[in-house]
């Protein structure tokens, strides 16, 4: 009779992915989550952003360990990942503020605030801009999202949407002009 046994499974890999990864992540979370949260706050993240960044760091650590990546010092890896997430958050905030500035800062009477992310008036302004972006035609909306949320250059936007870089620039220009017109018209009411 032919041997019809189950496929051979690397017991070490199975243990590593099922319990080793889990133990490593749990141990790190239990011992360092408060310090990681504090570090994220010192990077300038608000409480809810800091909490999300710590959770994202733990998730990324779990994924890396589960994929078999050897991480010599999970503690240092986690803090480095958290630092990068904090930097990414600041970059996103600058891009979003850049969009508001691009279509004409000072909407709703808020002027010369720079990129103060904690300013409630600025946050309302950014939300108003993205709400207006949502009402643009599909192609313009996609280009503005990829440019200002994903920070892609026009060459990559063109590749992503199957258009030329100059067409992407054109859609961005038209979309920005439409946003300026709509938002300033609402402001005049």
Residue positions per predicted region:
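Residue-level preference for hydrophobic side chains embedded in well-ordered alpha helices
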Residues: 28, 32, 36, 40, ...
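A short pre-motif secondary-structure segment
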Residues: 143-147
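Short amphipathic alpha-helical boundary/capping segments
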Residues: 11-16, 25, 128-136
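Structural recognition of an alpha-helix C-terminal capping motif at a helix-to-coil junction
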Residues: 52-59, 63, 72-84
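Arg/Lys-rich amphipathic alpha helix in sigma70-family domain 2
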Residues: 66, 80-109, 114, 122
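C-terminal flanking helix
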Residues: 33, 37, 58, 137, ...
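A short, charge-rich alpha-helical start-of-domain segment used by transcription regulators
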Residues: 3, 14-38, 48-51, 62, ...
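DNA-recognition helix of helix-turn-helix
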Residues: 83, 87, 155, 161-187
